[in-house]
């Protein structure tokens, strides 16, 4: 049980969602494994919001994500569907058939060297077949990290990572993984590539009952379920599955928050015409249907556009990443997600998912954009007011919702989180009598500094802000993306490169109801209206009718019109 926490159940739907989710859960796990000499005080974030306690059949306590994960056949690599900690009693049921048995064995995937190293560090498989996990402090997380006894971990290489399960370091509950065997992850045939295919999966009693059983298992053990967060691929058939799942949650758990993160890998190439057309159609159908059944929907992508015209991926001054690698893109988006979800994971004075959605989605604006500064440019010799002044009047975060350049747009409401700055740097340290460079330097607390800065940037915007000491953990298997000018804890240093591995970083993240969505959704509708659907009959054959397309197009235009105001190019 969560012991008074406002629990959240996560649904993770799709393969790119798996990459983002694996990094997300690894970061949660790293936050649990706090070093014994950590300077930041524990307890700002409540892990029980996302995790559940349980016991193996041998009585050993476990702490696993409250997660339902759906992916296709071939996506698990060497990870077992029932997980590695313990087996479900149903899975251990005796076989009643006494006749002759024929065994069919599939070729096993070789275990990734990183995961082999992880397992040897966490426990051993004893001679009686029982997995013996090494001692867990306070029943949660892995043993404390100490350099004296812990060998340097094997770092996964980009070449060794084929699927998200190759670098997931978190043990899952047997009820977490639900495989869809009628479609393949690999190969060109049998792919889940259209919205209608995804919708039809949850119309089949087999998969619908399996999802409902898992939902009931997790929900019934919660003391106070605040809602659901859905990590869902938008570009393929999982957009339809996600829409159907959101509809199910809305029907069965009325009044609970449903926040959907629509995930898009990037970039895409002009030469892949059918793939791009399907991506356009799936994204349009997904956004419309997900917004109808969710409290809030946020597209997440490092791409520059939702439409057919490709735009360069976004850039970060202190990161170097390969936008073609899901391993890299997933890490960056997970870091943003770990920051913008802070309000409903706080231990003290949390903002519920429902209240966060209500603050952002007024007047029908259920779609929001995300942005983040990764890492936030903290300099040891500067205070937060100094850093914010240097950012100037430009938008202080990189856009992460494929809505293009935010210049010339306005914000209707926003939720902003800044995490990972030492308290000593929250306010100005100027000597008494020194002229103040800005009103920010007169603020008494870091919370006042951040709130006043946001008010200066967007004077008439409904705004909520949080300032945390807890940084974002970026230890292996998080990829090495950071500038050589960063310290171990993500500060920007002067002089020669340090050569030190970055283990944690400060991050600024935001969710915004932005007029940039007027342009982005409007352009998406224009691209959709220009399609000759006779050329893409295979998409329609998957269960989508012509009337469905016309209705989606109209809904998309109506959704875009909700965001008129402040943009220099509104929808016609």
Swiss-Prot record:
<protein>
    <recommendedName>
        <fullName>Protein misato homolog 1</fullName>
    </recommendedName>
</protein>
<dbReference type="GO" id="GO:0005741">
    <property type="term" value="C:mitochondrial outer membrane"/>
</dbReference>
<dbReference type="InterPro" id="IPR049942">
    <property type="entry name" value="DML1/Misato"/>
</dbReference>
<dbReference type="GO" id="GO:0007005">
    <property type="term" value="P:mitochondrion organization"/>
</dbReference>
<keyword id="KW-1000">Mitochondrion outer membrane</keyword>
<dbReference type="InterPro" id="IPR029209">
    <property type="entry name" value="DML1/Misato_tubulin"/>
</dbReference>
<dbReference type="GO" id="GO:0005739">
    <property type="term" value="C:mitochondrion"/>
</dbReference>
<comment type="similarity">
    <text>Belongs to the misato family.</text>
</comment>
<keyword id="KW-0963">Cytoplasm</keyword>
<dbReference type="GO" id="GO:0005737">
    <property type="term" value="C:cytoplasm"/>
</dbReference>
<keyword id="KW-0472">Membrane</keyword>
<dbReference type="GO" id="GO:0010636">
    <property type="term" value="P:positive regulation of mitochondrial fusion"/>
</dbReference>
<dbReference type="GO" id="GO:0005829">
    <property type="term" value="C:cytosol"/>
</dbReference>
<dbReference type="InterPro" id="IPR036525">
    <property type="entry name" value="Tubulin/FtsZ_GTPase_sf"/>
</dbReference>
<dbReference type="GO" id="GO:0048311">
    <property type="term" value="P:mitochondrion distribution"/>
</dbReference>
<dbReference type="Pfam" id="PF14881">
    <property type="entry name" value="Tubulin_3"/>
</dbReference>
<comment type="function">
    <text>Involved in the regulation of mitochondrial distribution and morphology. Required for mitochondrial fusion and mitochondrial network formation.</text>
</comment>
<dbReference type="InterPro" id="IPR019605">
    <property type="entry name" value="Misato_II_tubulin-like"/>
</dbReference>
<keyword id="KW-0496">Mitochondrion</keyword>
<dbReference type="Pfam" id="PF10644">
    <property type="entry name" value="Misat_Tub_SegII"/>
</dbReference>
């Amino acid at each position: 049980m969560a012991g008074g926490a406002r629990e959240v159940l996560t649904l993770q739907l799709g393969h790119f969602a798996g990459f983002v989710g694996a990094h997300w859960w690894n970061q949660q796990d790293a936050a649990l494994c706090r070093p014994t000499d950590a300077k930041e005080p524990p307890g700002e974030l409540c892990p029980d919001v996302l995790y559940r306690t349980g016991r193996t059949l041998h009585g050993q306590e476990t702490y696993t994500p409250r997660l339902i994960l759906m992916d296709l056949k071939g996506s698990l690599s060497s990870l077992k569907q029932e997980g590695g900690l313990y087996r479900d009693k149903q899975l251990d049921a005796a076989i009643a058939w006494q006749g002759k048995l024929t065994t069919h064995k599939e070729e096993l995937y070789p275990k990734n060297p990183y995961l082999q190293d992880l397992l040897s560090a966490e426990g051993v498989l004893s001679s009686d077949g029982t997995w013996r996990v090494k001692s867990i402090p306070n029943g949660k997380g892995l043993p404390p990290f100490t350099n004296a006894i812990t060998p340097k971990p094997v770092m996964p290489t980009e070449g060794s990572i084929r699927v998200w399960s190759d670098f997931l370091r978190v043990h899952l509950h047997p009820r977490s993984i639900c495989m869809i065997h009628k479609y393949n992850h690999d190969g060109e045939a049998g792919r889940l590539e259209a919205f209608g295919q995804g919708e039809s999966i949850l119309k089949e009693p087999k998969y619908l009952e399996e999802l409902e059983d898992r939902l009931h298992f997790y929900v019934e053990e919660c003391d106070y379920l605040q809602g659901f967060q859905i990590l869902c691929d938008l570009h393929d058939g999982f957009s339809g599955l996600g829409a159907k799942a959101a509809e199910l949650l809305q029907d069965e758990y009325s009044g609970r928050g449903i926040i959907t993160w629509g995930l898009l890998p990037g970039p895409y190439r002009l030469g892949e015409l059918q793939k791009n057309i399907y991506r356009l159609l799936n994204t349009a159908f997904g956004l419309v249907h997900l917004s109808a059944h969710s409290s809030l929907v946020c597209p997440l992508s490092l791409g520059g556009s939702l439409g057919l015209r490709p735009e360069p991926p976004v850039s970060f001054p202190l990161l170097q990443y390969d936008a073609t690698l899901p391993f890299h893109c997933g890490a960056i988006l997970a870091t943003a997600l770990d920051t913008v979800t802070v309000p409903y994971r706080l231990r003290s004075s949390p903002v519920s998912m429902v209240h966060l959605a209500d603050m952002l989605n007024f007047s029908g604006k259920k779609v929001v954009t995300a942005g983040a500064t990764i890492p936030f440019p903290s300099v040891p010799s500067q205070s937060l007011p100094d850093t914010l002044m240097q950012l100037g009047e430009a938008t202080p975060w990189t856009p992460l919702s494929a809505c293009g350049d935010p210049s010339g747009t306005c914000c209707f409401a926003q939720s902003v989180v800044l995490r990972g700055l030492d308290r000593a740097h929250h306010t100005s340290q100027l000597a008494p009598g020194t002229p103040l460079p800005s009103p920010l330097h007169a603020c008494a607390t870091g919370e006042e500094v951040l709130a006043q800065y946001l008010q200066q940037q967007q004077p008439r915007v409904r705004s909520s802000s949080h300032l945390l000491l807890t940084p974002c953990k970026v230890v292996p298997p998080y990829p090495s993306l950071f500038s050589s000018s960063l310290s171990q804890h993500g500060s920007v240093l002067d002089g020669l490169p340090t050569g030190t591995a970055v283990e944690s970083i400060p991050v600024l993240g935001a969710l915004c109801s932005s007029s940039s969505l007027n342009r982005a959704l409007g352009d998406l509708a224009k691209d959709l209206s220009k399609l000759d659907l006779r050329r893409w009959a295979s998409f329609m054959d998957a269960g989508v009718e012509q009337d469905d397309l016309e209705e989606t197009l109209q809904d998309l235009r109506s959704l875009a019109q909700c965001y008129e105001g402040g943009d220099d190019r509104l929808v016609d």
